[in-house]
Amino acid sequence: MKVVAAFLLAVLSGKASPTTGDIKDILGSVGAETEDSQIELLLKEVKGKDLAELIAAGREKLASVPSGGGGGVAVASATSGGGGGGGAPAAESKKEEKKEEKEESDDDMGFSLFE
């Protein structure tokens, strides 16, 4: 990841195609070490490609990866643009809050440590 970040910094600083030395200089300025093979692999993969195209391709790949948890529900209701989708998540959060309150009261099990 640090090699990719250094590559992006080099491109954003005005170098159209950064070299291994450019990336090593950036990483060296913050005391980060990396293997030459990692830098060479990155430069080989991005050679001749536009930065905007690389970012767009990365976004497409990330969008295709499923994310765990309830995040998909929120995205689906937010992107659906439907009228009634907003009420359901609010109702669910109220139910969860009530459950949490009940669990907290059960923690003492009927006695106090300080009595």
Curated annotation (Swiss-Prot):
This is Large ribosomal subunit protein P2z. The modification Phosphoserine is found at S105. Plays an important role in the elongation step of protein synthesis. One of its GO terms (molecular function) is structural constituent of ribosome. Residues 92-102 have a biased composition (Basic and acidic residues). The keyword Iron does not apply. Belongs to the eukaryotic ribosomal protein P1/P2 family. P1 and P2 exist as dimers at the large ribosomal subunit. GO terms for cellular component: cytosolic large ribosomal subunit. CDD domains: Ribosomal_P2. Residues 62-115 are annotated as: Disordered. It comes from the Eukaryota. The lineage of its organism: Eukaryota, Viridiplantae, Streptophyta, Embryophyta, Tracheophyta. Phosphorylated. Disulfide bonds: none annotated. Keywords: Phosphoprotein, Ribonucleoprotein, Ribosomal protein. GO terms for biological process: cytoplasmic translational elongation.
